[in-house]
């Protein structure tokens, strides 16, 4: 009985330290949360009016190209009309491309898709950078 009390007395500070460390770490570490889908849902033809805004942009992929010879190894999904006359583009940079289970230029070509993200302008063409496949949802035509 006396030995048990000694062990309990010795273990109490260790248990208290573990509890305190757990509480501190629960405040420091927060799993990455997925932002809620934006309220703004538009077509590719409306995207130019919403530069800088977070939106869901929907349309049909008219052309799709993986260009490994360009710096950053981009994949371009072009909407409205084929490149170079596209009205909207989704760009997937090489560093993000490995996250897709199949080549995006093959998977999405001629598909109606919706992409979620912040609309930027690149050389006058609105675009969204897709970093993860979850940003792109295939739609039924």
Whereabouts are the PLM-identified features?
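OB-fold and OB-like single-stranded nucleic-acid-recognition modules
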Residues: 4-141
